[in-house]
Amino acid sequence: MKFYFAPLEGVTGFTYRNAFADLFGGVDKYYAPFISPCVNDKLKGKEIRDILPENNSGKVNLVPQILANRADYFIKATKQIMDMGYTKEININIGCPSGTVVAKNKGSGFLRDTDAMDRFFEEIFNWRDSDESGLDISVKTRIGVNDAEEFPEIMEVYNQYPISELTIHPRTRKQMYRDTPDMNAFDYAFKVSRNPLCYNGDIRTVMDYENFAKKYNVDAVMIGRGLIANPQLVNEIKGQEKLTKEMLKQYHDRLYRDFEKIMKADKHLLFKMKEFWNYVSWNFEDENKCAKLVRKCQNLYKYNLAVEEIFGTMELK
């Protein structure tokens, strides 16, 4: 089984990925948060900063991800990204449920127009084949906009093209991250897909993974929030020791130092570290108390006192 780190915009940027790779690793691929190309001839510095090779550790096998519904924008951006050295794989995001993204018929909003999807894929694969670059084009998708009944028509489009890997998050856009993954929809994809599948959705514990792996013989799983919450999760799945407070503190301290170097103000660093605790507080026996201690901090002095209390007095599950 291959393990992939899912992208999460605003969270899994290069500073985060580098710290994770140094201290935990175990992941075969890291998918970068999406780049959204537009009418400009070239992607600008802010758009590509996260994937610049000099910003990413050699331990990070990074796959850039593009959010687009126009083939010309995708091709233009892909050429520039390939010139940066990313010549193995580009991932297309057709899963993002964000309202601002969906309103532009991008991400999971693209799923409402399968005819447009078909034209998009036809054009980009014709370009890829004529370019003879050997580039793998993979896709991350949801199962529909409002209802899983949309999924068979969506799969018909995917099955017409040589997608290197189809990562399925079996929720609709309407569900966002609510409810549970629709495994009936994944069952359907497992039976009919002509392309290799990767599963994404609610793998947060070793048991979650084992229950999935018993039923489905797929080559890869992509984990996002589960790995952000427990950075040792993939290693635990592989039989290594469970996450310890010492591991988590080392990780926290590394991220704090690294973010401190690039944040322009204390309030930005405080926000970033509170975001970290939004996920990792789940590991503690009293996760609500842990989260509350951090949430009420209004400055870094109080934040550091709260962190000292958490690691000094609270235990992991």
Put a short name on every predicted segment:
Residues 1-317:
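Flavin-dependent oxidoreductase catalytic cores
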